[in-house]
Curated annotation (Swiss-Prot):
Cytoplasm recorded as keyword: yes
PROSITE patterns the UniProt entry points to: SER_THR_PHOSPHATASE (PS00125)
GO biological process, one term: mitotic cell cycle
Family: Belongs to the PPP phosphatase family. PP-2A subfamily.
Active site: H115 (proton donor)
Any single Gene Ontology cellular-component annotation: protein phosphatase type 2A complex
Pfam families to which the protein is assigned, alphabetical: Metallophos
Localization: Cytoplasm, Cytosol; Nucleus speckle
EC number: 3.1.3.16
Binding site for Mn(2+) 1: D54, H56, D82
GO molecular function, one term: metal ion binding
Annotated protein name in UniProt: Serine/threonine-protein phosphatase 2A catalytic subunit A
Cofactor(s) this protein requires: Mn(2+)
Length: 306
């Protein structure tokens, strides 16, 4: 029990939406790096599991998610990235998820999203928030260095393939993903970039993405990929969907988005997907948590709603 005493203390502080000290974050990130560096690019996950999409610093809504989905470690969780940026509590959100990973490493899987990057966080809020809360960029650096170790994808019972963004013209099989060197900043192009940036589309084949990174991919691509790899489903996040989840490509792909009323103004529901021991899935939708006024922050972050 002794080894987790500190982490239990961190978790109880964080659950009150209070940030840890810089030295506590350093300690936590060292422990997390040790765990994440042993995980695979396609991290195996057992069912039952609850699959979650983007959180984007909406801490109170993450608390609501745990209320609805169950607490760690009672529920086995898989998060598909984008913990930071845009919301007001990126620091507390990402620190809590990393602390839960360290405390319950076999019951929490955290993947990398396109926002878990040095470049993106300098534009969309996490960097500025770290500066505001700590007075220097050290905590931002600790986390962005840790992000390089996050697994890119997960595979539930060899059947459901989970990742932040989508498919890539450079990747036909899961073995290709296993062979990538993931410990680096998210590149501007190539397989690793595509996994974190691509989106499903109504047009067939691969197309250029309006995001300027990754590709769009059609139903033919999803069907072929699932067939080649013996998969029943690709589960991904990365796109705001008004009901919190959205099927496409003849149920070969599902998008899950777990930040309700995204950016405190989009009016969307959030959802999580529960997969039971028989691999049957159920979606739980939820509204934003009631919040007492937001901190006064001048927003310098550009809006991109893609």
């Amino acid at each position: 029990m002794g080894e987790f005493q500190d982490v239990d203390k961190y978790i109880s502080i964080l659950k009150e939406c209070k940030p840890l000290s810089e030295s506590e974050v350093r300690d936590l990130c060292e422990k997390a790096r040790e765990i994440l560096s042993k995980e695979s690019n396609v991290q195996p996950v057992r069912c039952p599991v609850t699959v979650c999409g983007d959180i984007h610093g909406q801490f109170h809504d993450l608390m609501e998610l745990f209320k609805i989905g169950g607490n760690c470690p009672d529920t086995n969780y898989l998060f598909m990235g984008d913990y930071v940026d845009r919301g007001f509590y990126s620091v507390e959100t990402v620190t809590l998820l990393v602390a839960l990973k360290v405390r319950y490493k076999d019951r929490v899987t955290i993947l990398r999203g396109n926002h878990e990057s040095r470049q993106i966080t300098q534009v969309y809020g996490f960097y500025d928030e770290c500066l505001r809360k700590y007075g220097n960029p050290n905590v931002w650096k600790l986390f962005t260095d840790l992000f390089d170790y996050l697994p890119l994808t997960a595979l539930i019972e060899n059947q459901v393939f989970c990742l932040h963004g989508g498919l890539s013209p450079s990747i036909d099989t899961l073995d290709h993903i296993e062979n990538l060197d993931r410990v680096q900043e998210v590149p501007h192009e190539g397989a690793m970039c595509d996994l974190l940036w691509s989106d499903p589309d109504d047009r067939l084949g691969f197309g250029y993405s309006p995001r300027g990174a990754g590709y769009t991919f059609g139903k033919d691509i999803s069907e072929q990929f699932n067939h080649n790899n013996g998969l029943t489903l690709v589960a991904r996040a990365h796109q705001l969907v008004m009901e919190g989840y959205n099927w496409c490509h003849d149920q070969n792909v599902v998008t899950i988005f777990s930040a309700p009323n995204y950016c405190y103004r989009c009016g969307n529901l959030a959802a999580i997907m529960e997969i039971d021991e028989k691999m049957k899935h159920t979606f739980l939708q939820f509204d934003p948590a009631p919040r007492r006024g937001e901190p006064h922050v001048t927003r310098r972050t550009p809006d991109y709603f893609l």
